[in-house]
């Protein structure tokens, strides 16, 4: 017997699910028999008759270990004990869409990397709708992200293969990383900024990818400068951390310990230093 008082689905015979049905209200119909399907009028997610999430979401990396996976499945509504993420979360590498066993994905993944969509037949290519993060057959990033400082040492670099090459100490970025750590000219532990680097890894140009070690170490302090432009104020010391501050984030976005999200509200940050979701 389930929350609707029936054993064969949340159809009309259940009376639309009552207050004991996880807060879904009268719109909790439309689930197929067995309550695992997702009908057109299903809540997102809906606990029907037995604790199964009918629709999205699956586990996401950000929700794993924060009550999102396991106890509540990272759902958009109160689901109580209905958690599971359509097949169980495991180590949680999944995505905001249907992921099968959450970490598995569109083609079978393993330790997860890849992108949200648009992967070619070999799961290494990128289509126009590529974003982050769904597993694609093997752990490599189709488009974004490469390694970020916050993910390094936490499965983001190395085991998760979140760049197209070895990440080293991980100073990466949101864009394609090439060998991720190479710094186009040899820069040591890699970090730098979004500007281009000359062959000596000291001068700034405009066409270089990221990450690159930008500007000289003549006046360092504690990691100065900004993410764009690379003017004379963009001094980067041998620490080679990504620049602090990003356009659009305001002065509150500056932190001396660069390798962290830098927004004043943590919910608006992404795991790239001082890159904000506006």
Swiss-Prot record:
In the hair cortex, hair keratin intermediate filaments are embedded in an interfilamentous matrix, consisting of hair keratin-associated protein (KRTAP), which are essential for the formation of a rigid and resistant hair shaft through their extensive disulfide bond cross-linking with abundant cysteine residues of hair keratins. The matrix proteins include the high-sulfur and high-glycine-tyrosine keratins. GO terms for cellular component: cytosol; intermediate filament. The lineage of its organism: Eukaryota, Metazoa, Chordata, Craniata, Vertebrata. Residues 42-271 are annotated as: 8 X 4 AA repeats of C-C-X-P. Expressed in hair root but not in skin. Expressed also in lung, pancreas, ovary, testis. Belongs to the KRTAP type 5 family. The keyword Repeat applies. This is Keratin-associated protein 5-1. Sequence repeats lie at residues 42-45, 48-51, 130-133, 136-139, 142-145, 239-242, 258-261, 268-271. Keywords: Keratin, Repeat. Interacts with hair keratins. The gene is KRTAP5-1. It comes from Homo sapiens.
């Amino acid at each position: 017997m389930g929350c609707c008082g029936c054993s064969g689905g949340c159809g009309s015979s259940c009376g639309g699910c009552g207050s004991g049905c996880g807060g879904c209200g009268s719109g909790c119909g439309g689930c197929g028999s067995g309550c695992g399907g997702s009908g057109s009028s299903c809540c997102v997610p809906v606990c029907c008759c037995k604790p199964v999430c009918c629709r999205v979401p699956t586990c996401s990396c950000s929700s794993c270990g924060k009550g999102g996976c396991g106890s509540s499945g990272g759902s958009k509504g109160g689901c109580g004990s209905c958690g599971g993420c359509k097949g169980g979360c495991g180590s949680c590498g999944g995505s905001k869409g249907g992921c099968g066993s959450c970490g598995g994905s569109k083609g079978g993944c393993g330790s997860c990397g890849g992108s949200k969509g648009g992967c070619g037949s070999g799961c290494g290519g990128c289509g126009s709708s590529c974003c982050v993060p769904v597993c694609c057959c093997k752990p490599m990033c189709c488009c974004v992200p490469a390694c970020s400082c916050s993910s390094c040492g936490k499965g983001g670099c190395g085991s998760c293969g979140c760049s197209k090459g070895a990440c080293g100490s991980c100073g990466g970025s949101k864009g394609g990383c090439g060998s991720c750590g190479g710094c186009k000219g040899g820069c040591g532990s890699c970090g730098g900024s979004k500007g281009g680097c000359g062959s000596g890894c000291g001068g700034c140009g405009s066409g270089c990818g990221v990450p690159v070690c930008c500007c000289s170490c003549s006046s360092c302090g504690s990691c100065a400068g900004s993410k764009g432009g690379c003017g004379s104020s963009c001094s980067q010391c041998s620490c080679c951390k990504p620049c602090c501050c990003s356009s659009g984030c305001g002065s509150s976005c500056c932190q001396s310990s660069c390798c962290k999200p830098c927004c004043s509200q943590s919910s608006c940050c992404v795991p790239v230093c001082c890159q904000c979701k506006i």
